[in-house]
C-alpha cells in the first residue's frame, strides 16, 4: 500500500528509482483528468468484491464514503498530490488509505490490475466526453447552420469548382452542405460510442480474474453495454482510442475545409461575409487589418489533431500482446485531440452565428457565363443530345468572348441561330439566376424546396 513513500509495485525492489526516471514514468500530471472515472470504477469494483464475500458490508460502506470524500477534494481542486503519486490510480488509493485506514483500503485492489483499471477509466472517460461534451457541441454547430440556412434561404451566390465560378447556388445550400458533413460526423460518433462502451474490468493483468468476479455485474454498474470477452484483448485494446482520434481527424478535416471557404469569402477580393470582432484579430503594425484568425486557427489546428493520431499509431504499431508501457502514450494525444475538437466546434459555432452576410456582393458575383449549362439544358429540352448541346453552348461562350461581350446573354438571336438554328426567342428566358437554381429541384439540389427538405431531414437525424 502506498503511503506517499512506497510504490504500489515496490515490494521486489531494493534500489531507488532515478529521479528523472520517476518523472519520465509518472502520468499524474495529465491522467488526473480521469479522477472521476477512476473513482467510479473503484466504487463498482469494490461492490463486486463484496458480492464475492471479499469485503464486508461495513468495509464496503467505509470505502464508498472515502471515495466520495476524494471526489469532493478533486471537484473542489483541493486534492493534495504527493511526489510519489505515480498516476491517478496510485494517488486515489494512497488518499483512500489516509481517509479510511490502510488495512481496509488495501483490499480495494484485490484481483485487479492497473492494466484493466486504466483502460476501464479510459473507456468511461471517453464515453463521458462523447456524451457530455462532443455530442452537445456538435449538435449546437449543426443547429446554428440550419437556423442560418432557413433564415437566409433567398440569398444567391456563385458555387465553385476548382475555385472557379461554376453555377449559381443558394447561400443556404452551402450552409446545408456543412450541416450535412457535421451530421454525418454526429452519426459516426454514435457508432464509435457503441463500440467503445464495452467493459474490460475484471480481466486482471492479462489472464483473468482469480476470484471469479461477476464481470457482467461490473459492466452493468458502470453503464457498459457488454464485457470484452477475452482478457488479453480487454487489457491491451486501444482501438477505441484510435477510432475516436480518427473521428477527430475526420471532423477537423471537415472543419478545415469549412474554415477555408469562409476565409476566402471574407477577403476584400470576395467580400461575401464579414466576421464579427469577437472572432477576429488585428495587426501589430497595420491598423487597417482585420484578420480571420479564428478560421485560420481552425484550419491550422486540424494538422495538430492529425499529428495526435499518427503519433499514437506509431507508438502502438510494434508492441507485443497485452499491456506495455508504450500504451501510457495514449493519453496525452487523446486528451489533446478531444479538447482541440471540442474547442473547434465551439469556435466554429461562434463564427457562423455572428458573421454578417453581404447579400449584394454575393449576388453581384453571379455572371451570365455561369448559366452556360442552363443554355445546354435549354436545347436538351428541345430533344438535342446533351453531348451535342454541351459543345454548342461552349461555342456560344467562345463567340461572346471573341466579340468582347460581357456575357452570353448579350448575343443576339441572330448570332445564336448562326451557331445553331434550333435556338428560338425563348432562349433568353434561360438567363435568370433564380430560375436556374429553382430548376435544380431534385433531392439534394439548390432549389428552395430541395434545400428546405435537406434542412428538415438533418433536423430529424439529430433528433
Swiss-Prot record:
Pfam families: ASL_C2 (PF14698), Lyase_1 (PF00206). It catalyses: 2-(N(omega)-L-arginino)succinate = fumarate + L-arginine. GO terms for biological process: arginine biosynthetic process via ornithine; L-arginine biosynthetic process. The record marks 296 as: Increases basicity of active site His. Its EC number is 4.3.2.1. The keyword Glycosyltransferase does not apply. Coiled coil: none annotated. One of its GO terms (molecular function) is argininosuccinate lyase activity. 2-(N(omega)-L-arginino)succinate binds at residues 27, 115, 161, 291, 323, 328, 331. Transmembrane segments: none annotated. Pathway: Amino-acid biosynthesis; L-arginine biosynthesis; L-arginine from L-ornithine and carbamoyl phosphate: step 3/3. InterPro entries: Arg_succ_lyase_C, Argininosuccinate_lyase, Fumarase/histidase_N, Fumarate_lyase_CS, Fumarate_lyase_fam, Fumarate_lyase_N, L-Aspartase-like. The active site is at residues 162, 283. Keywords: Amino-acid biosynthesis, Arginine biosynthesis, Lyase. GO terms for cellular component: cytosol. Homotetramer. PANTHER family: ARGININOSUCCINATE LYASE. NCBIfam families: argH (TIGR00838). Belongs to the lyase 1 family. Argininosuccinate lyase subfamily. This is Argininosuccinate lyase. It comes from Saccharomyces paradoxus.
Amino acid at each position: 500500500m502506498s503511503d506517499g513513500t512506497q510504490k504500489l509495485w515496490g515490494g521486489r525492489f531494493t534500489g531507488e528509482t532515478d529521479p528523472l526516471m520517476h518523472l519520465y514514468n509518472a502520468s499524474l500530471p495529465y491522467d488526473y483528468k480521469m479522477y472521476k472515472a477512476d473513482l467510479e470504477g473503484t466504487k463498482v469494483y469494490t461492490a463486486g468484491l463484496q458480492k464475492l464475500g471479499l469485503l464486508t458490508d461495513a468495509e464496503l460502506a467505509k470505502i464508498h464514503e472515502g471515495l466520495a470524500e476524494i471526489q469532493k477534494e478533486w471537484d473542489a481542486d483541493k486534492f493534495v498530490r504527493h511526489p510519489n503519486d505515480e498516476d491517478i490510480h496510485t494517488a486515489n488509493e494512497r488518499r483512500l488509505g489516509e481517509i479510511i485506514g490502510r488495512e481496509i483500503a488495501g483490499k480495494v485492489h484485490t484481483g485487479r490490475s492497473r492494466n484493466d483499471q486504466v483502460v476501464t477509466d479510459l473507456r468511461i472517460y471517453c464515453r463521458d466526453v462523447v456524451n457530455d461534451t462532443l455530442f452537445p457541441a456538435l449538435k449546437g454547430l449543426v443547429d446554428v447552420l440550419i437556423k442560418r440556412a432557413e433564415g437566409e434561404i433567398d440569398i444567391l451566390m456563385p458555387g465553385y469548382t476548382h475555385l472557379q465560378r461554376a453555377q449559381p447556388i443558394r447561400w443556404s445550400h452551402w450552409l446545408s452542405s456543412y450541416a450535412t458533413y457535421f451530421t454525418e460526423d454526429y452519426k459516426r460518433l454514435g457508432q464509435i460510442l457503441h463500440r467503445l462502451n464495452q467493459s474490460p474490468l475484471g480481466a486482471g493483468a492479462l489472464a483473468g480474474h482469480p476470484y471469479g468476479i461477476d464481470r457482467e455485474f461490473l459492466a452493468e454498474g458502470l453503464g457498459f453495454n457488454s464485457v470484452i470477452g477475452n482478457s488479453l484483448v480487454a487489457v491491451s485494446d486501444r482501438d477505441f482510442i484510435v477510432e475516436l482520434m480518427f473521428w477527430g481527424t475526420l471532423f477537423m478535416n471537415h472543419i478545415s475545409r469549412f474554415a477555408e471557404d469562409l476565409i476566402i469569402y471574407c477577403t476584400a477580393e470576395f467580400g461575401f461575409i464579414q466576421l464579427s470582432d469577437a472572432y477576429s484579430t488585428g495587426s501589430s503594425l497595420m491598423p487597417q487589418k482585420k484578420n480571420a484568425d479564428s478560421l485560420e486557427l481552425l484550419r491550422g489546428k486540424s494538422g495538430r489533431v492529425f499529428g495526435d493520431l499518427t503519433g499514437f499509431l506509431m507508438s502502438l504499431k510494434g508492441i507485443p500482446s497485452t499491456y506495455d508501457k508504450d500504451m501510457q502514450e495514449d493519453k496525452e494525444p487523446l486528451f489533446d485531440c478531444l479538447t482541440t475538437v471540442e474547442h473547434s466546434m465551439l469556435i466554429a459555432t461562434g463564427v457562423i452565428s455572428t458573421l454578417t452576410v453581404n447579400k449584394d456582393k454575393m449576388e453581384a458575383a453571379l455572371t451570365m457565363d455561369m448559366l452556360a449549362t442552363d443554355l445546354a439544358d435549354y436545347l436538351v429540352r428541345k430533344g438535342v443530345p446533351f453531348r451535342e448541346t454541351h459543345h454548342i453552348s461552349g461555342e456560344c461562350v467562345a463567340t461572346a468572348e471573341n466579340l468582347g461581350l460581357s456575357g452570353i446573354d448579350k448575343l443576339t438571336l441572330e448570332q445564336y441561330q448562326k451557331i445553331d438554328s434550333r435556338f428560338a426567342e425563348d432562349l433568353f428566358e434561360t438567363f435568370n439566376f433564380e430560375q436556374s437554381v429553382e430548376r435544380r429541384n431534385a433531392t439534394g439540389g439548390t432549389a428552395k424546396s430541395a434545400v428546405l427538405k435537406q434542412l428538415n431531414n438533418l433536423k430529424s437525424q439529430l433528433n
